[in-house]
Amino acid sequence: MATDLTQEFCALRDTYIEKQFGRLNDMKRQAVFTTDGPLLILAGAGSGKTTVLVNRIANLIRFGSAHGSKQTPRPATEDDIKALRNAIMTGTAAPSWLDGMLRQNTVRSWNVMAITFTNKAAGELKERLRRMLGGEEGDEVFASTFHSACVRILRRWAEEIGYPRSFTIYDTDDSQRVMKAVYKDLNVDDKFLPIKAAISQMSRWKDQLVSPEQALASPAKDTKGALTARIYAAYEKRLKEAGAFDFDDLIYQTVQLLAEHKDVRDFYQNKYRYLLVDEYQDTSVAQFRLVSLLTGPEKNICVVGDDDQSIYRFRGATIENILNFERIYPGTKTIRLEQNYRSTSNILNAANCVIQHNTERKGKTLWTSNGEGDKVQVYTAENEQDEASHIADVIGQHLKEGGHLADHAILYRMNAQSAPIESYFTRAGIPHKIVGGQRFNDRKEVKDIHSYMSIVANPRDDVRLRRIINEPARKIGATTVEVITDLAAQEGVSMLDIIGHADQYAKLSRAVMPLLKFWQIYQRLQDSLETRTLDEFAADVIELTGYKAMLEADAAKGHEDAADRLQNLGQLVNNVKNYCDQHGEEATLEGYLEDIALISDIDSYNESADQVVLMTIHSAKGLEFPYVFLIGMEEGVFPSEMSKYSEADLEEERRLAYVGITRAKKELYISNSVSRMLYGRTQRNEPSRFLREIEPEYIEETRSPVLEQRSRFGGWGDSYRDTVPGGASGYSGPSGWGRSASGYGSGGYGSGYSNRNGYLNREYNAGEGRGFGSAYANRGQSQSGYGSGYGRSGAGTGYGSGYSSAYSDRTTQKKSAKQISFTGAPAAKTAAKGAKHYEPGDLVEHKVFGRGQVVAVKPAAGDQIVEINFEKVGIKKTMANFAPLTKITAEE
């Protein structure tokens, strides 16, 4: 009887536990209830992997391995069954006296480590755990980034590898300062071996766990390779003397620590019995090794990732880590999460079409119950200005329909592509934010104050000391700094030790007074740290160093940026206070400096600001937006030119396209341009192969009105279809649009498969079109060029003809450009005849901001700066000739 009751109770317990995770789909519940041994969760884009991580941790802590178990700590009773059945039926919590019967092999919250790639993701994970488990248990789970986890380990054990526990973390600027000193010591010419190239190679070595000794011992391919190894050794020696790690060292040195010290390794394997790693597809060799060293003998490791979103190969990530996980950890259970909760079917189908062309992947197909949604909008622009104008038009329409600026993201392959968009938006007065621009903590005044704070935390930090010893100016010149550096090296002490005893060194006799004054400032800062709160200490640094007085004097002299720099320092103090509020009694100077060193671009992205966001696709990883514009979908741009020569690189580019597509929730806009200027050179590009890989049924294509107008003269070939039984259909592509360069135009090209308008070159590999054409041009004048195109696929054939213009020199091209007007994108200089003119009181309508009234007008370089009070967004300033403005009457 007791056995029967226990079996009944176990069945009810399974039902009760399942109800606690009732919002999860079947595959997610499988992942949550798989508690022991290695687990690989292949989580597709938008599948809710954070939800799985949070719920899996919650299950480990609350129920352990109880689900699916046939065991109980004691025989079940009728009362147990009655109470549990009632809880299930009423949807209430089971009585506390049943807790012991509902648990089995539960895990203490402090025995769980969850590693993510961004502070933002770690923060979201912890916040959701607090809500699910309660504040105390949620806080005890260690959720952190790789680098933050390593900092925590090193703060405790750094002395085991010869570093102080108060070590400093160097950023890129600090590393370059160290390298300049190394180059001087080794007499290396930066022109022969650029510092950035040496730093990149050292970073690769650290990612691959190659020590300076191993680099020196390895046969070098050339002189530069051997020299870089010597630089690496000298660089690491200087960092150790300064008690500092660079960003790559945080993982590299932690791996060395764990590998070489079994007691440290055992401590963490026993402490963190369950390890969960997010974004595993983006781990490097060093991160893979770190994870394996932290994983205990029970192999309770769960990794979550998507091989189709592995896009950081250039940073050392290796997709093989996730592809080979099952081989490395025998007995792995693999679960695929393919249901997407973010996007519409058309968007997901487009993404699936693209990624299925990759071969190095586990394989999965995203699907959704969100509905079909709008088709993917593909726009072919004449050039990048036309592309920007089109995007502004679409955003304006969305705003009229009640949308918000922050709903829109413009994503691109490379940073250089943002300039035309930014320029157009600035002139049109469209609020926007570039993620990945200069960060707050990278501003000079902020870095200077942080350097002062750093030398108080770590007196051995000579690099930061050199930065600010004469900032503000104190009559401590470069020669004096070199003397101090040499003395410190001779005596094996820090530069601050020399400065504190400057009066004892004859070589410093001329600079004794400035140096001792600096020493007094340093001592006062130390006193401030010991006696005042951390934010008060930050304010003291700004005041006592003379930095505030320097900027106030600059402001009085009329320096334009002085007021902004003062405001930035005020914000710095606010940031320190916010850090103190978040960490309470655990707030320390070292902790604050760690936080700012580990902040990424995405961590500083403010989602609440109502502005269009511009960022690279790499930066957009993990984000989502209702409306996404994926620009520059052209051969040589996306995919990049260099990727064409490597199948591995091309597959990474395709994964990047997949990531970009899957950022969109409601609508996706993809654009390609016939002509694009990048890095000062204008080139004509074919549409990207990734566009051609999307099936026509999922997209809707339009093109620039200028291109439409040209097509009337044969600029774009008409589609022609000849279907042959047993063979593929043949279509003509954008045949005949000529390429103009050096006074001639070349013919167009055909394609194996075009859309209904005949201008996307599809089936790039299967049926590549061959174009033939000619153009005639005399230098100094523009002439017409006639091109014809031919394409075939299988047994089908397609033909088309086109007309193109070739402009033989820059003068003619510029003249012609004035004759072409783009909707919403005027030429750089508008002729007086067509210039817009506004007066205070004029009623206007803006494509983005809606209706408003002109309140002020100011002439500016043949244009007008117009100040407008808009009904919806208030006062905005914009350039008259660039803004998408239309005069209206009161009746309108």
PLM regions and their residue ranges:
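P-loop NTPase Walker
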Residues: 1-164, 169, 266, 320, ...
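Helicase P-loop NTPase motor core
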Residues: 47-53, 68, 73, 77, ...
